[in-house]
């Protein structure tokens, strides 16, 4: 798994200094649910290239970003230097082996497979006084990937958000939750879209031959570019 995320790092979304429209809505909802980051210690589990980590670093007192991918962390540290962010600690580790021996003001994790099961979720709960967790509410729709899934079930989808929500109910842990939706288009060159599709298909256990993928995408390309429509539904848990 580490190798897959290392491979993705070069083309993964990076911190630009400003949150996207979707992320602004996410942060507004987190604030509405009572979490404040000002002057707080934060840990970001599965931080990737630091899109959230670096934004929060500009608000909080200190933040630790943990990820299994050294290449992802390298990108995050490059962007931290670019934006003069110095209150950041990067830790390369999987979540099961991450043992900071402290409790943070806020434990934060968005769209990361690092928190994989109930044992991990309990560990996540114990990491923070407040916790913010975001995961898929249902499988993401991609107009490009649908060309290759051909109606097959995506075995990689894990309904963790609803499972963890039920855990909070069982344990009588008060929480707020909501579903956030996003619809967008992504335009890439034929080669970029080919490599992106191959990565997503491989991680979903739908491996396809590279030339076949490129040929299929060539048939829908316009002037050397392919436009992908993406529809996402995510569940936010704040507690």
Question: Where would I find each of the regions flagged by the language model?
Answer:
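A short, conserved alpha-helix within the catalytic core of class I
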Residues: 114-127
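Conserved class I S-adenosyl-L-methionine
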Residues: 1-36, 40-48
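Short alpha-helix
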Residues: 157-172, 176
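Short conserved loop adjoining the S-adenosyl-L-methionine
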Residues: 97-102
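Class I SAM-dependent methyltransferase SAM/SAH-binding core
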Residues: 51-86, 91-94
